[in-house]
Swiss-Prot record:
Presence of the UniProt keyword Hydrolase in the record: no
Entries under SMART domains matching the protein: HOLI, ZnF_C4
SUPFAM superfamilies named among the record's database cross-references: Glucocorticoid receptor-like (DNA-binding domain), Nuclear receptor ligand-binding domain
A family per Pfam: zf-C4
Compartment(s): Nucleus
Organism: Caenorhabditis elegans
Swiss-Prot/TrEMBL keywords: DNA-binding, Metal-binding, Nucleus, Receptor, Transcription, Transcription regulation, Zinc, Zinc-finger
Lineage: Eukaryota, Metazoa, Ecdysozoa, Nematoda, Chromadorea
Zinc finger regions, NR C4-type: 11-31, 47-71
Region Disordered, annotated ranges: 87-128
Protein name listed in UniProt: Nuclear hormone receptor family member nhr-47
Gene3D superfamilies: Erythroid Transcription Factor GATA-1, subunit A (3.30.50.10), Retinoid X Receptor (1.10.565.10)
UniProt function note: Orphan nuclear receptor.
Length: 579
């Protein structure tokens, strides 16, 4: 049985959070299991280096020989292992029915276990080797991570919007070698004014500040700091465009709809019209109402039928009569119009499926919510301190009356076409690139508003997307570390949602948030393509740091010695069709 330790006690082997005193030494579950399995299975390891490899939280599974030697050096006792009790492998256990003890459910215990310690060693521990107490400790260790990322996101907004002396880095190499601004005292306050620029095109100004802080933000993660330089460059350039798009979408306030009320024509006046072509007139007026988006009365269809029948009676064509005498009209039987059964919605905010496309049964006109098909908005929300971007900055090259909330951005033809600028013209706007703008609004900004992202959810999604194990160029050891970090962050996000929502709502919201990742990467890929064209044709002056992070770094002396090239200095390299 492990001995309880004071909160915050670190593992003597890897400096991770210790879960107890195992084999006479305060250690984490990963090192405890590694030590036990290495001795029980009589494992023999070989060091590929000089037998002095670093053993810490980030790279503890890189060299198992040095890790085992450090376990012995810190005092782990071989004699404390009880072979009969410390069984390795599958152990059949009775099913536990008390789900409350799991604090989040059995289904996610494996994800939470892998993420609790940030260990890149995924195969050292199995669900059978974990007990209920270990899972509880792991769950509780996830909460400080969410709090830290939320604080980090708030400080990011503070430095981005209020810090007037924030300077961009000259190169990506300088940015990676400099200390992170988030690990230094912050001189600005929330009471300071928002930083302004005199340029008409404000987005390049904000983007160079975003990229500078983005690199400082990445350096706050210990897993990132432990990576080799080449892998750091690969991770920064892989997520740079996605980071910019997400920040711009999250920090842009929503414009309210303009208060324009159109008065609807009075329906009785339309009915009593005695024009020569009353039926067509009523139909045309009603059609104009529908086309203008007005709120038409529910009985409009019956109104049209009644007007047409009355006009036909006046002309004597319904029953084969040529006379229009009032006496004949009074004696003619008027057929009763069969109305579709009306279903009154139980709640407000419902819409009825259309029935005007052919003679559909009345059952087809069922009531559905107005937001049917859209994800459910969260109830946490974000603070107004993050809303300082001006939404009109995204309207450069668009009509002055554009409203990001009112108009659909699916149709590219809505935007005004921009004239081609000569290579010497440097005043063209990046936001005027129509495909990038529309994709950013449709794929990122609108879903963010529909989901009503909270600061914690946004911060966790940023970190999850940053630690992408599929980043091109990562070596195998770095990829294992990145996988473990991403699994930990995924567990933190799910744990946070479980605390804020009921189980079903938490699962649905977790899926909705994670499913945003492919769309964000799709918009980022389109953004990179546009930047490549602008840079190649010299249509726009791009900040050097933004160019390096989005298009790839320029080869520096250090990179040339390491055999690393770049794609932004000189000619651009486009993939061939065979690739």
């Amino acid at each position: 049985m492990s001995e309880k330790l004071p909160p915050g006690t670190l593992c003597a082997v890897c400096d991770d959070i210790a879960t107890g005193k195992h084999y006479s030494v305060a250690s984490c579950n990963g090192c405890k299991t590694f030590f036990r399995r290495a001795l029980v299975n009589n494992r023999e390891f070989v060091c590929q280096g000089n037998k002095d490899c670093p053993v810490n939280k980030g790279v503890r599974c890189a060299c198992r020989y040095c890790r085992l030697q450090k376990c012995l050096a810190v005092g782990m006792d071989k004699n404390s292992i009880q072979n009969d009790r410390d069984r390795i492998g599958y152990t059949k256990r009775k099913r536990r029915h008390d789900d409350n003890d799991m604090e989040g459910g059995v289904h996610h215990s494996e994800h939470i276990r892998d993420g609790s310690s940030g260990s890149p060693q995924m195969n050292d521990e199995s669900p059978e080797s974990m007990d209920m107490k270990d899972i509880k400790i792991d769950l509780n260790c996830l909460d400080p991570i969410a709090d830290r990322l939320t604080t980090l996101e708030n400080n990011f907004t503070l430095l981005l919007s209020r810090c007037a002396d924030l300077h961009s880095y000259a190169t990506l190499e300088d940015a990676l070698n400099a200390p992170s601004r988030f690990m230094q005292p912050i001189s600005c306050e929330w009471s300071d004014n928002v930083v302004l620029t005199n340029r008409d095109d404000k987005l390049p100004f904000w983007r160079q500040r975003l990229i500078a802080l983005y690199i400082d933000w990445a350096k706050t993660f210990s897993t990132f700091r432990s990576l080799p330089y080449a892998d750091k460059v690969a991770m920064v350039t892989n997520h740079a465009s996605s980071f910019m798009i997400m920040c711009e979408a999250f920090r842009t306030p929503e414009h309210m709809k303009s208060d324009v009320v159109r008065k609807r024509p009075d329906l009785p006046n339309i009915v009593t019209s005695n024009s020569g072509s009353g039926c067509s007139r009523v139909s045309s007026v009603a059609g104009s109402l529908v086309s203008n988006g007005e709120d038409v009365h529910d009985d409009l269809t019956n109104l049209l039928h009644a007007a047409c029948i009355q006009q036909s009676i006046n002309k004597g064509i319904m029953f084969g009569e040529n006379s229009s005498d009032d006496k004949i009209l009074l004696n003619l039987p008027i057929r009763e119009i069969k109305k579709e059964p009306l279903e009154v919605p139980s709640t407000e905010g419902m819409i009825q499926l259309p029935t005007e496309y052919g003679n559909l049964p009345a059952d087809y006109a069922s009531w559905i919510p107005q937001d049917y098909g859209h994800p459910t908005a969260g109830h946490e929300g974000k603070s107004d301190m993050h809303n300082f971007f001006e939404a009109r900055d995204f309207c450069v090259g668009r009509p002055s009356s554009c409203n990001l909330n009112e108009r659909s951005m699916k149709t590219v033809s809505m935007l005004e076409s921009r004239n081609f600028q000569s290579p010497s013209a440097n005043n063209s706007s990046l936001s005027g690139i129509t495909p990038v703008l529309t994709m950013m609004i449709d794929l990122v900004m609108k879903p963010f508003r529909q989901l009503n992202f909270s600061t914690t959810e946004f911060a966790l999604l940023q970190a999850i997307m940053f630690f992408d194990p599929d980043t091109e160029g990562l070596d195998s050891a770095s990829q294992r570390n990145v996988v473990a970090e991403q699994k930990k962050l995924l567990a933190v996000l799910f744990r946070h949602l479980q605390k804020a929502y009921n189980p079903q709502a938490a699962s649905e919201r977790y899926a909705s948030i994670i499913l945003r990742m492919p769309s964000i990467r799709r918009a980022a890929a389109k953004k990179n393509e546009s930047l490549q064209v602008l840079d190649m044709l010299q249509m726009h002056e791009i900040n050097s740091l933004v160019k390096e992070t989005s298009l790839g770094p320029r080869p520096s002396n250090v990179q040339q010695r390491m055999g690393i090239g770049g794609g932004a200095g000189g000619c651009l390299t486009f993939p061939s069709q065979e690739d």
